[in-house]
Amino acid sequence: MSSTSSTNTDDFITIARIQKTQGRVGEVFSELFTDFPELFEQRHHLYVLPEKGERRELELEDHWFHKGGVVLKFQGIETIDDAEKLLRSEVQIPRQDRAQLEEGATYVSDLVGCELFEIHGSEARKVGVVADVDFSAGEAPLLVVKGDREHLIPYVESFLKSTDFKAKRIEMVLPQGMLELDAPLSKAEKERQKSEADETREAGERRKR
């Protein structure tokens, strides 16, 4: 499975996001969103899409991998001020140029934005929309699904009933109880619930005074 950012268009996919300046001559440190770092070796030009503004093509002068990310040096970006203008931009390539996957593998960019439905017999219950994919939990990637609450759902063949990436729809048959409150929570959801519990406890203590 190739990981890419959720920020994609029909014609481009994001392979990195620029996070900070690096050095004094225009280099930028970028978070990787691809399992295929050789994409940077194969290309002399990349596309940069800022948070606000138009996508533009830049010539890649140099790159090296550093602390789990990649440092990029673009032609024409020569100073820290130049580099700061690229912060939070998406680094993209044309969709047609993305790496070929092994049979049965899936691009994260295809998963993100899909509506996920839990199937019970002939009934389909919408769980939410896939916002991201978490690879840090173990062998099986977890779909980060946001609906009434956030769920982490293993993306495994045994749960899959059907996928239609053109229609942005995934159907799954999930084990009983997986979507209940005692199901595994993401770190963000745990922190939110802890914060709510702390506020409730503090309110109770104030009433006792």
Curated annotation (Swiss-Prot):
One of its GO terms (molecular function) is ribosome binding. Keywords: Chaperone, Cytoplasm, Ribosome biogenesis, rRNA processing. It holds the Pfam family PRC_RimM. GO terms for biological process: ribosomal small subunit biogenesis; rRNA processing. Belongs to the RimM family. The PRC barrel domain binds ribosomal protein uS19. This is Ribosome maturation factor RimM. The gene is rimM.
